[in-house]
Amino acid sequence: MEVGIIGATGYSGLELIRLLKNHPQVTNIMLYSSSQSGETINRLYPHLQNEQWKPLKEIDLNKISAEIDVMFLATPPGVSAEWSGPLLEAGLSVIDLSGDLRLTDRGVYEKWYKRPSAKEGLIEQAIYGLSEWNKSTIKTAKLIANPGCFPTAALLALIPLIQAGAIERDSIVIDAKSGTSGAGKSPTSMTHFSETNENFKIYQVASHKHTPEIEQQLAKWGAQPPLSFQPHLAPMVRGIMATIYAKAAKPLSNEWLTDCYNSAYENAPFVRIKENGTFPATKHVFGSNYCDIGFCYDERTGRVIVASVIDNLMKGAAGQAVQNFNLMHGFDETAGLEAVPMYP
């Protein structure tokens, strides 16, 4: 299968290149860029220099259906809203890694993203690509809205508990930490080395745009928004840890929680449940498509505490996009994603 990437020079795009280059079902990768057409990716990024790459191309909708079968959009907000429709009309399947198509309410999107939403009809076509919970609809989709990094970590931890009626659905607090690559490649004072090294900081207090995405998806499972979600920036490049607190809806035990999570993810190759009261760390999933989940029932407070870790560029972006690509086209779900985490 021949695939294309728009936004190949960003961090998520580069991760897509790494994964798709080793995918057993991918025969060709075309890289597209309007700002850097004519450049070669291995000149821009020397870690790719041993591979032979065609120059970055401008998109020509009259030719694109003859060049590729699937397009990955690893682009900033607004680009997918413009390009997804024409790409679908050209006969391609589209996997969008941006937030343009995740929110079904246009007013909510415009409030949180501070920009116009996608055209009417496009959002309705998009399937939310949380691989472990939307497999049946992903398998028949032509357009995937790949989940955000924070929502992926939070949703995988919370859906089993909400589904089982284990927590008070209006008591959820999500306290999340992310590495600097989650902010993208463009340098800012927020991610400057001098600002992040030996530093730990809160940001976008009560205003992060992943908040309505988490609320929208949890509402489908019976949760009652609003919830509290707060991200922090950690002095590391990759990784997310979401520590989640919720009031138990009934007396629980760690044994019950273990059974709940093991049952929910029995057939999920990329979700690993910690045993015997152990908890995950971001290093445990570094460079992989895994989500590791640990948990505890605090009898003293009557709260459930859950820790969920992912690599934000993998399970939080490119890895889950490739997982959805596999599901859409009937490939083994793990194809191209079998690499074990890098450690230390």
UniProtKB/Swiss-Prot annotation:
Subcellular location, principal: cytoplasm
Subcellular location per the Swiss-Prot or TrEMBL entry: Cytoplasm
GO cellular component: cytoplasm
Substrates-to-products reaction catalysed: N-acetyl-L-glutamate 5-semialdehyde + phosphate + NADP(+) = N-acetyl-L-glutamyl 5-phosphate + NADPH + H(+)
EC main group: oxidoreductase
MF annotations from Gene Ontology: N-acetyl-gamma-glutamyl-phosphate reductase activity; NAD binding; NADP+ binding
Gene Ontology biological process terms from the UniProt entry: L-arginine biosynthetic process
Catalytic residues (UniProt): 149
Pathway recorded for this protein: Amino-acid biosynthesis; L-arginine biosynthesis; N(2)-acetyl-L-ornithine from L-glutamate: step 3/4
EC annotation from Swiss-Prot or TrEMBL: 1.2.1.38
CDD domains, A to Z: AGPR_1_C, AGPR_1_N
Coiled-coil stretches noted in the UniProt entry, renumbered to this chain: none
UniProt keywords, alphabetically: Amino-acid biosynthesis, Arginine biosynthesis, Cytoplasm, NADP, Oxidoreductase
Functional summary from the UniProt entry: Catalyzes the NADPH-dependent reduction of N-acetyl-5-glutamyl phosphate to yield N-acetyl-L-glutamate 5-semialdehyde.
Protein family membership: Belongs to the NAGSA dehydrogenase family. Type 1 subfamily.
Protein name according to UniProt: N-acetyl-gamma-glutamyl-phosphate reductase
Source species: Shouchella clausii (strain KSM-K16) (Alkalihalobacillus clausii)
Gene name linked to the record: argC
